Amino acid sequence: MYKNGFFKNYLSLFLIFLVIACTSKDSSNEYVEEQEAENSSKPDDSKIDEHTIGHVFHAMGVVHSKKDRKSLGKNIKVFYFSEEDGHFQTIPSKENAKLIVYFYDNVYAGEAPISISGKEAFIFVGITPDFKKIINSNLHGAKSDLIGTFKDLNIKNSKLEITVDENNSDAKTFLESVNYIIDGVEKISPMLTN
């Protein structure tokens, strides 16, 4: 039916293309894996991802659109702190940070780890420059109805003077975490403004 080995030539050509395609795919996969390994081994803590920018702006009460996050987020200053016995020390990265402080347009937001209903999460708290009021707060990594109550509250002596139900462990944890952030941000604020 086919003269002069047409089928044999067609099959040989097909096999050559198949080998080239497989080799090309393997090398591109290796390149992607190398890039992912390089990126994961050296995190860039000077840049904040858009999701975190959203949490920070929400806590600060900054109204913005999703498409503006990246450009506005470039103006956020980020500071990482370790803490021992109430004394805060700056550290170079997010790793081992007990408190992360964001500073934007003369407003502060603090981020700290929190455990809510057995889930590890992070709480963000926005604080006015005079440390007299909490602007807003929000969670990343857990959900809680309590979060809506921790906004627009007065601060006195570096803490919220409110009472929570002693039997509600999440409410106690919220209050402790918010007060920890307020106290920490107020203590380290002179370092940020210099």
From Swiss-Prot:
Claim: Lipoprotein is one of the keywords in the record: yes
Principal subcellular localisation of the protein: membrane
Keyword list, A-Z: Cell outer membrane, Lipoprotein, Membrane, Palmitate, Signal
Lipidation (N-palmitoyl cysteine): 22
Signal peptide location: 1-21
Locations listed in the record: Cell outer membrane
GO cellular component: cell outer membrane; membrane
Protein name, entry field: Outer surface 22 kDa lipoprotein
Organism of this sequence: Borreliella burgdorferi (strain ATCC 35210 / DSM 4680 / CIP 102532 / B31)
